[in-house]
């Protein structure tokens, strides 16, 4: 059994011989994980599944403890060789022979697995094999690529190969005992006339790859909402934690459930009434297309999409994503102490994820603390792309201004602008920055007009040039109120109470510039001096793009610390989608879902026998009365 623990100096990998089945969840120290109580894990969040603890979208406001960034940074400098940023599934040495035999026929193996094979061969050339209790080979660190393929499927594939060879050997031994002349070939099992164990297992594996049109529940407890659509090997140990709702919004309901294929806790988002109208259909199609393309430390990625059993009943969508332990809103309102180091690391990660989105030609349009998921290691991920849309940076297209939660809405949106850019997301980051510094919402107004007035009270009356995208009614309202000077003293009080941190004041002013054309860009904000320490801490011990190899004197940093999206969305895609009817969009969405390969090669389905199924089926999105107020109709 493999698990991560954290000591005073580094992360450590625990290897137990009690269980040989690898769990990919325990090999990632920055993803959602169920933390056990041991002497190395003293700065973690409470378990998200225990009542009263924080979760990714729950309602609890209990105290949480964050990772000590300063201690981690100092520890990494002193003992960098002990840091393992990621590990691959470990193969017992007594099973490496099966992998080597398979390697003769399939030349393409993971480089780290080949490393183990070479190491094992070298070991056996110098030492005689001993019939002792099997031990595990050394852990090989990951490569320097951010987007790593999941190792879970590879490990289970190797387990299947090992089991196949064991079955062949047992069958061969049985044939010798009964005196039969036929021998089972390890390399050509099909040469045997009768059906061998190898062939039976091959047939079983082929059946697993075939996804039936009518899924049947398999390998699932009666309490689990998710079930595998077909049998698979090996059946994981069922998680005893109950499935439960953890949040809901205008476009979906999120539950914390167990993936029956891995035993890992994941977030299941239910999107009902997808085809209620054309706007809803476009919004859902945008969201799943975006989530499918994300591969970034600071952006929530899609794990799987449940395939509909029948296209005639394709009315709602079920999406699996990572499960995080809390969000930034719960941290801000909790009694947890936030140091300047925490603020710098959080703001840096928000901007880092936002750069990834903007370079993909995506506007999030709802950046707020509740949509910024955080785990106990202070890894932050941007989530909830229900209001996001693609955007042509060279052309200002007419878009709705009914976006962004009011407290974090940019002044151009409050003033009815129909043409806007990624500057609306930058304004939201500025509001969150101030909220982290003073532990309260910066502009907390009862309505949009009061919200605009609070902004003017702080920043002063804008010029005509700064209001060039606003509608005439909003301009007249601002001008009738008279001229107001900016409250510079209050800005300094928010960003620098001790009157020493002038860099924080400078960044806050640039993020909260009234004129969207003069507001700082995400690339410029990432290069601001205030965030230099946050960048250093993040890439010293938290990111997946930089790492430390054994016997290396220093940490290896990625060439691009703030990567761009690899394949930006073509602005024409949004225009082409606007020309389609709802029937055509439904067909495209169905084809997209069906063409996407299932995670681990095994499809999932909803289990109607689950004890929580009735509550899950009846769960609905937020009602109109629960939603924030609409923008002012100027």
UniProtKB/Swiss-Prot annotation:
Expression (tissue specificity): Expressed in the pharynx and seam and vulval cells.
InterPro entries: Kinase-like_dom_sf, MAP_kinase, MAP_kinase_CS, Prot_kinase_dom, Protein_kinase_ATP_BS, Ser/Thr_kinase_AS
Binding residues for ATP: 246-254, 269
MF-aspect GO terms: ATP binding; beta-catenin binding; MAP kinase activity; metal ion binding; protein serine kinase activity; protein serine/threonine kinase activity
The keyword Kinase belongs to this UniProt entry's keyword annotation: yes
Subcellular location: Cytoplasm, Cell cortex; Nucleus
Gene Ontology biological process terms in this record: anatomical structure morphogenesis; asymmetric cell division; asymmetric protein localization involved in cell fate determination; canonical Wnt signaling pathway; embryo development ending in birth or egg hatching; endoderm development; endodermal cell fate specification; intracellular signal transduction
Entry keywords, A to Z: ATP-binding, Cytoplasm, Developmental protein, Kinase, Magnesium, Metal-binding, Nucleotide-binding, Nucleus, Serine/threonine-protein kinase, Transferase, Wnt signaling pathway
A GO CC term attached to the entry: cell cortex
Annotated consequence of substituting residue 400 to A: No detectable kinase activity
Catalytic activity: L-seryl-[protein] + ATP = O-phospho-L-seryl-[protein] + ADP + H(+); L-threonyl-[protein] + ATP = O-phospho-L-threonyl-[protein] + ADP + H(+)
EC number(s) on file: 2.7.11.24
Family annotation (PROSITE patterns): MAPK, PROTEIN_KINASE_ATP, PROTEIN_KINASE_DOM, PROTEIN_KINASE_ST
Broad class of where this protein is predominantly found: cytoplasm
Protein kinase domain mapped to chain residues: 240-531
Pfam families on file: Pkinase
Effect of inactivating the gene: Defects in body wall muscle, endoderm development and pop-1 asymmetry. RNAi-mediated knockdown disrupts tail tip morphogenesis resulting in retention of the pointed larval tail tip in adult males (also known as the Lep phenotype). RNAi-mediated knockdown causes the transcription factor plp-1 to localize at much lower levels in nuclei and instead accumulate in the cytoplasm, during embryonic development.
Catalytic residues in the record: 366 (proton acceptor)
Top class in the EC scheme: transferase
Cofactor list: Mg(2+)
Subunit field text: Component of the beta-catenin-lit-1 complex (also called the lit-1/wrm-1 complex or the wrm-1/lit-1 kinase complex) at least composed of lit-1 and wrm-1. Interacts with wrm-1 (via N-terminus); the interaction is direct and activates lit-1 kinase activity which leads to the phosphorylation of pop-1. This promotes pop-1 interaction with par-5 and translocation of pop-1 from the nucleus to the cytoplasm. Interacts with pop-1 (when phosphorylated on 'Ser-118' and 'Ser-127'); the interaction is dependent on the beta-catenin-lit-1 complex.
Protein family according to the UniProt entry: Belongs to the protein kinase superfamily. CMGC Ser/Thr protein kinase family. MAP kinase subfamily.
Role summary: Has a role in the Wnt signaling pathway controlling the asymmetry of cell divisions during embryogenesis. Operates in the AB and EMS cell lineages influencing cell specification. Required for body wall muscle development, endoderm development, pop-1 asymmetry and T-cell division asymmetry. Component of the beta-catenin-lit-1 complex which promotes the phosphorylation, down-regulation and subcellular relocation of pop-1. Regulates plp-1 nuclear localization in embryos. Plays a role in male tail tip morphogenesis.
Protein name in the entry: Serine/threonine kinase NLK
């Amino acid at each position: 059994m493999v698990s991560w623990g954290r000591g005073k100096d580094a992360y450590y990998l625990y290897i137990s011989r009690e269980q040989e089945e690898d769990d990919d969840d325990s090999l990632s120290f920055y993803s959602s994980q169920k933390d056990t109580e041991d002497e190395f894990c003293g700065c973690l969040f409470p378990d998200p599944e225990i009542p009263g603890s924080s979760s990714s979208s729950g309602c609890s406001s209990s105290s949480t403890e964050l990772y000590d960034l300063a201690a981690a940074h100092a520890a990494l400098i002193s003992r960098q060789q002990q840091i393992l940023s990621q590990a691959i599934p470990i193969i017992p040495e007594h099973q490496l022979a099966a992998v080597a035999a398979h390697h003769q026929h399939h030349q393409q193996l993971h480089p780290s697995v080949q490393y183990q094979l070479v190491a094992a061969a070298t070991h056996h050339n110098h030492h005689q094999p001993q019939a002792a209790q099997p031990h595990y080979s050394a852990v090989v660190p990951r490569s320097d690529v951010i987007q790593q393929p999941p190792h879970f499927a590879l490990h289970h594939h190797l387990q299947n190969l090992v089991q196949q060879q064991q079955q062949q050997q047992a069958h061969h031994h049985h044939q010798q005992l009964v005196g039969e002349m036929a021998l089972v070939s390890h390399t050509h099992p099909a040469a045997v006339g009768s059906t061998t164990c190898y062939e039976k297992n091959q047939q079983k594996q082929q059946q697993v790859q075939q996804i039936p049109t009518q899924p049947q529940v398999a390998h699932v407890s009666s309490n689990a909402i998710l079930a595998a659509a077909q049998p698979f090997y090996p059946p994981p140990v069922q998680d005893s934690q109950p499935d439960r709702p953890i949040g809901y919004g205008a476009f979906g309901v999120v539950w914390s459930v167990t993936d029956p294929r891995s035993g890992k806790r994941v977030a299941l988002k239910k999107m009902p009434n997808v085809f209620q109208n054309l706007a809803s259909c476009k919004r859902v199609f945008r969201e799943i297309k975006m989530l499918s393309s994300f591969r970034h430390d600071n952006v929530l990625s899609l794990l799987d999409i449940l395939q509909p059993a029948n296209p005639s009943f394709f009315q709602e969508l079920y999406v699996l994503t990572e499960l995080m332990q809390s969000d930034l809103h719960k941290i801000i309102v909790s009694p947890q102490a936030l140091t300047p180091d925490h603020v710098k690391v959080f703001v840096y990660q928000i901007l880092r994820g936002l750069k990834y989105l903007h370079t993909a030609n995506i506007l999030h349009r709802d950046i707020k603390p509740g949509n910024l998921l955080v785990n106990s290691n202070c890894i932050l991920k941007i989530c909830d792309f229900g209001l996001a849309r693609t955007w042509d940076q060279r052309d200002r297209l007419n878009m709705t201004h009914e976006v962004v939660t009011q407290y974090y809405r940019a002044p151009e949106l409050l003033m009815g602008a129909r043409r806007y850019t990624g500057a609306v997301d930058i304004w939201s980051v500025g509001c969150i920055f101030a909220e982290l510094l003073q532990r309260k919402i910066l502009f907390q107004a009862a309505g949009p007009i009061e919200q605009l007035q609070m902004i003017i009270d702080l920043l002063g009356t804008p010029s005509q040039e700064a209001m060039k995208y606003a509608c005439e009614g909003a301009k007249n309202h601002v001008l009738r109120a008279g001229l107001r000077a900016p409250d510079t003293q209050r800005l300094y009080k928010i960003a620098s109470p001790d009157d020493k941190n002038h860099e924080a004041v400078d960044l806050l002013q640039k993020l909260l510039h009234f004129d969207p054309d003069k507001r700082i860009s995400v690339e410029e904000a990432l290069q601001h001096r205030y965030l230099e320490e946050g960048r250093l801490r993040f890439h010293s011990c938290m990111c997946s793009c930089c790492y430390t190899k054994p016997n290396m004197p220093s940490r290896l940093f990625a060439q691009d610390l703030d990567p761009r999206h690899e394949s930006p969305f073509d602005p024409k895609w949004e225009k082409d989608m606007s020309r389609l009817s709802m029937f055509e969009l439904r067909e495209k969405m169905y084809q997209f879902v069906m063409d996407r390969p299932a995670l681990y090669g095994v499809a999932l389905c909803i289990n109607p026998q689950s004890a929580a199924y009735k509550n899950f089926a009846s769960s609905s999105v937020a009602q109109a009365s629960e939603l924030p107020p609409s923008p002012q109709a100027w």
